[in-house]
A protein has these predicted regions:
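ATP-dependent NMP and nucleoside kinases share a basic, alpha-helical "lid"
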Residues: 107-157
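ATP-dependent small-molecule kinase phosphotransfer cores
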Residues: 45-119
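Well-ordered beta-strand positions
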Residues: 39, 45, 139, 183-184
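Walker A (P-loop) phosphate-binding motif
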Residues: 11-45
Length: 210
């Protein structure tokens, strides 16, 4: 159990922010935590949950972007995508709507796991530093590869050319910068087994596994 100085030395949950760069293998590490019974709050899941049929998020999107982005009561992602990716101002509007709702969803999920007294709660957030989430976690773990490995894995995963892959990588904060801000770094340049060993060793060292 994590002992925190912010609560008079009382035992409480450690909130670990998990992030990385595009195609560096964050999902692999996230799944390893889940396989070991560690609760993971996944921001990508939250992004889908907050715009489900009947949600406040879907209503807000309809008010701002119109009926054309709704199909049979569901979000028409293709129609919305066409609007926001052709107009940066529209994308900014969408990010403002979703950002607040996703933050609220993450907070509620995190608090639920804390109330259940889990010693470790992982917040899996792709743009953790870019969105300022380092302020709400106790520690940050970055899953990293070299830029060359990242580039080739992204090209292979998304079946895209090198120029497109470089543009996607350039849209995020460089992985090397994230590593400098991390409390823990998982080196994902090697095999999945090598990554698994690093995660298991970390869990044991932090006394979350015995």
């Amino acid at each position: 159990m994590y002992v925190s100085s912010r609560d008079g030395g009382a035992a409480m949950s450690l909130i670990l922010g998990l992030t990385g760069g595009i195609a560096t293998g964050k999902s692999t590490v996230s799944n390893l935590f889940k396989e070991n019974g560690i609760p993971v709050v996944d921001a990508d899941v939250g992004a889908r949950e907050v715009v489900k049929a009947g949600t406040e998020g879907l209503k807000r999107i309809e008010v701002v972007f119109g009926h054309q982005v709704i199909s049979s009561g569901q979000l028409d992602r293709k129609a919305l995508g066409k609007i926001v990716f052709e107009n940066p101002k529209e994308l900014e509007k969408l990010n403002r709507i979703l950002g607040d709702l996703i933050a609220e969803w993450i907070h509620d999920e995190k608090e639920r796991y804390i109330e259940e007294k889990h010693p470790l709660v992982v917040l899996d957030i792709p743009l953790l530093f870019e969105s300022g989430y380092q302020e709400v976690v106790d520690r940050v773990m970055v899953v990293a590869t070299t830029p060359d490995v990242q580039l080739h894995r992204l090209m292979e995963r998304d079946q895209i050319d090198e120029q497109t892959a470089r543009q996607k990588i350039a849209a995020q904060e460089p992985i090397m910068d994230k590593m400098l801000k991390a409390d823990f770094v998982i080196d994902n340049n090697g095999t999945k087994e090598n990554t698994r060993i690093q995660v298991m060793n970390w869990l044991k060292k932090q006394q979350f596994l015995h």
